[in-house]
UniProtKB/Swiss-Prot annotation:
SMART domains: DnaJ. Residues 91-222 are annotated as: Divergent targeting domain. The gene is Dnajb9. SUPFAM superfamilies: Chaperone J-domain. It is found in: Endoplasmic reticulum lumen. Residues 1-23 form the signal peptide. Disulfide bonds: none annotated. GO terms for biological process: B cell differentiation; ERAD pathway; negative regulation of IRE1-mediated unfolded protein response; positive regulation of immunoglobulin production; response to endoplasmic reticulum stress; response to unfolded protein. The J domain stimulates the ATPase activity of HSPA5/BiP, while the divergent targeting domain is required for efficient substrate recognition by HSPA5/BiP. The divergent targeting domain specifically recognizes and binds to aggregation-prone sequences. This is DnaJ homolog subfamily B member 9. The modification Phosphoserine is found at S133. Co-chaperone for Hsp70 protein HSPA5/BiP that acts as a key repressor of the ERN1/IRE1-mediated unfolded protein response (UPR). J domain-containing co-chaperones stimulate the ATPase activity of Hsp70 proteins and are required for efficient substrate recognition by Hsp70 proteins. In the unstressed endoplasmic reticulum, interacts with the luminal region of ERN1/IRE1 and selectively recruits HSPA5/BiP: HSPA5/BiP disrupts the dimerization of the active ERN1/IRE1 luminal region, thereby inactivating ERN1/IRE1. Interacts with HSPA5/BiP; interaction is direct. Interacts with ERN1/IRE1 (via the luminal region). Interacts with DERL1. InterPro entries: DnaJ_domain, DnaJ_domain_CS, Hsp70_co-chaperone_J-domain, J_dom_sf.
Length: 222
């Protein structure tokens, strides 16, 4: 029969082992960012890792476990209050006495993560590719235009020197095939707009050469 002293020693050992396991599971290391990382850096790292390890895209046996870990880290570090608690207290801020997450996280109970929601800020995916691409490029690349001042060539230039969208272009080209992208270094995406009440037919053309993206509106008609 175990004595109270042996039970106490056993409990201490379990606690120490749990702390060691949690200490080795550093959320910043999981996402590959420094502790001083900005919200944008954390989000960028999460997007990149989620694209790589999401079970719908990665069929390796450990992909789901890795994705859970990534999502758990992002769940904490993307929230300012939770991140502050984590930085001060560590994992114990979100665990019960048994070393389990105590906040009712969906990642603890079941695996239910919407891959489409992951890229809602970069809306280039989905069944209706043309509609989503149009929305994306109009939101991010096209300046508001007054109806009376539309011109045949309205140019906008953007530098993607290592920025977030540049990385997204590279990642998406590796994983997906777009009809709007050709095999050379020139990338062209076209979206079309029909203006009601007139016979004018306009399209938004976005071209990428190297690190420069040029967008213009091409209008034709009576």
């Amino acid at each position: 029969m175990a004595t109270p002293q042996s039970v106490f020693v056993f409990a201490i050992c379990i606690l120490m082992i749990t702390e060691l396991i949690l200490a080795s599971k550093n959320y910043y290391d999981i996402l590959g960012v420094p502790k001083s990382a900005s919200e944008r850096q954390i989000k960028k790292a999460f997007h990149k890792l989620a694209m790589k390890y999401h079970p719908d895209k990665n069929k390796s046996p450990d992909a789901e476990a890795k994705f859970r870990e990534i999502a758990e880290a992002y769940e904490t570090l993307s929230d300012a209050n939770r991140r502050k608690e984590y930085d001060i207290i560590g994992h114990s801020a979100f665990t019960n006495g048994k070393g389990q997450r105590s906040n009712g996280s969906p990642f603890e109970q079941s695996f239910n993560f919407n891959f489409d929601d992951l890229f809602k800020d970069f809306n280039l995916f989905g069944q209706n590719q043309n509609t989503r691409s149009k929305k994306h490029f109009e939101n991010h690349f096209q300046t508001r235009q007054d109806g009376s001042s539309r011109q045949r060539h309205h140019f906008q230039e953007f530098s993607f020197g290592g920025g977030l969208f540049d990385d997204m272009f590279e990642d998406m080209e590796k994983m997906f095939s777009f009809s709007g992208f050709d095999s050379t270094n020139r990338r062209t995406v076209q979206t079309e707009n029909r203006f009601h009440g007139s016979s004018k037919h306009c399209r938004t053309v976005t071209q990428r050469r190297g690190n420069m993206v040029t967008t213009y509106t091409d209008c034709s008609g009576q």
